[in-house]
Structures are given as C-alpha cells and as structure tokens.
C-alpha cells in the first residue's frame, strides 16, 4: 500500500526510544524525513544512526527538555517545515492520591500534559496558516479507563484526550487534522525490563517474563511497530477524513467487562 507521504517531514517528541522510535522507524520506512526530540543526546544519536543506515532519510536531532515552554517554542522555530507533529514525550509515574506528592505530579504533567500543549500551540498555528498538517497525540489507555493507583496518569491522559477531541473538531476549518492514539501495554525496552525484573522475583527466572502476560489480550503486549504503523497511517492522506478522535490500541482491554 502506497501511503503517499514520501518526502514529508515529521517531528517526533520522545522519538529516540520506545513508541516514539517505533513511529520514527515506520515514517522513515515510508520515506519521511525526521526531526527527533528527546532529552538524551546519546540516545538521539543512536536512533539517528539506525534510521539513516536502514532508510537513508534525513534525521535531525534535538536534545531538549520539553517540560519548559520556552524550549518548546525554540524547538518549533527549528521545525517550521514539518508536515506532521507526533507528541509522544513524557511518562507519568504510578501512585495514588495519598502517595503521589505535588512536586512529582506537577513535574510529570509539565512534560506529558503541558509539553504536548506547548509544542502543539506553536506548530498548530503554523499549520493553520498554510492550511495543511497532521498532529497525532500518543496518549495512553488509562485516560479511557482510569484507575486510582495511576491517578495522575489517568487524569493527565483524560485531559489530553479532551484536548485532542476539541482541537480536532475545530481543525478541519483550517485544513489540519488532530488525532490521538491510546496505547495499552506496549513492549518497549523499559516495559520488558520491568517484566524481566518481576519474573526474576516471582518465577526465579527473568527469561520467563512472557509468562506474566498469559492473561493479557493475545497473551502479549503491543509492539512498537504496531503503534508506529498506526500513527504513520493516521498521518497519511489515506486517513484524510480522520480527526478529533482517539484510537485505543490495547487488544480490547478497555472494552472488557470486569
């Protein structure tokens, strides 16, 4: 299937690892040139080397902390040519109302919630002015199915879902699309590391970590390639009538009855 996005340019925040890198791989496979933003210059350089070697596209790296609105504005000025913005940076820690302190809560929202808002504000204005562009917010399934043990993440993700729907309802007036993706459990390096640690503790062998997923849909987690493929399709003109909606990728977990 030809997606019709060869030569387009994309900015991916949190693009050096995990889901962000999965998105980068799939966009590069389609011939897109990339801007990758993340905090670690070393991780960015490693990601760039892999992408250039495999796909021969242009990859520009930006080592930046997007929890600071001024940094988001500066990044936007360096990426005025992008056709696609993929907001993916940030992770909100587990914790209940009683155990999660205000400092941790606010710091994580500065990156995951306000970080999305700040960079979107900058680039959405440019997309409106030229009447083209796609914004994909990679959010999280806890926004759809909130739990008290992940209260800050549930609330932050729900806020970003509302942000996506509101902006995506307005954006067609300006020739722009705004959509969201809610990943469930995804086999990132970080997630697998945690499962290996748990398997070592509970099963006595880290290599048995996949046994811990036996009750998950399909007995596994999503792959970063599956998430990347969806985001890439949403960026393409083949998904040109999709805006203001959220697609949940969790193997049906949010639709299950307890």
Annotated model-derived regions:
Residues 125, 169-170, 240:
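Alpha-helical segment proximal to the catalytic Tyr-Lys
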Residues 120, 156, 164:
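Active-site helix of classical SDR
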Residues 172, 177, 242-244:
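Short, small/polar-rich loop/turn modules that mediate ligand/substrate recognition or access, typified
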Residues 100, 146-155, 166, 194:
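Active-site loop-to-helix junction immediately N-terminal to the catalytic Tyr of the SDR YXXXK motif
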Residues 96-97, 104-109, 212:
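Substrate-binding pocket helix/loop in short-chain dehydrogenase/reductase
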Residues 9, 16-18:
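Conserved glycine-rich cofactor-binding loop
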Residues 19, 145, 232, 243-258:
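Short C-terminal tail/terminal secondary-structure segment
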């Amino acid at each position: 299937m030809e997606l019709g996005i060869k030569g387009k340019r994309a900015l991916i925040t949190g693009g050096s690892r995990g889901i962000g890198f999965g998105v980068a791989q799939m966009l590069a496979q389609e011939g897109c040139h990339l801007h990758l933003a993340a905090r670690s210059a070393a991780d960015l350089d490693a990601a760039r080397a892999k992408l250039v070697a495999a796909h021969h596209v242009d990859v520009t790296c930006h080592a930046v902390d997007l929890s600071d609105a001024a940094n988001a504005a500066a990044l936007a000025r360096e990426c005025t040519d992008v056709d696609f913005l993929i907001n993916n940076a940030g992770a909100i820690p587990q914790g209940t109302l009683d155990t999660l302190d205000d400092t941790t809560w606010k710091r994580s929202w500065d990156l995951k919630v306000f970080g999305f808002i700040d960079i979107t504000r900058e680039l959405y204005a440019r997309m409106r002015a030229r009447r083209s562009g796609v914004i994909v917010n990679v959010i999280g399934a806890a926004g759809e199915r909130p739990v008290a043990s992940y209260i800050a993440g549930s609330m932050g993700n729900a806020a970003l879902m509302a942000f996506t729907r509101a902006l995506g309802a307005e954006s067609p007036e300006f020739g722009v699309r705004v959509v969201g993706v809610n990943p469930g459990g995804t086999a990132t390096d970080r997630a697998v590391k945690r499962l290996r640690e748990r398997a070592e503790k509970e099963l006595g062998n880290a290599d048995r970590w996949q046994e811990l997923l036996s009750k998950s849909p399909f007995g596994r987690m999503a792959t970063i390639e599956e998430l990347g493929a969806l985001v890439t399709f949403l960026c393409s003109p083949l998904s040109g009538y999709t805006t203001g909606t959220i697609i949940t990728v969790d193997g049906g977990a949010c639709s299950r009855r307890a």
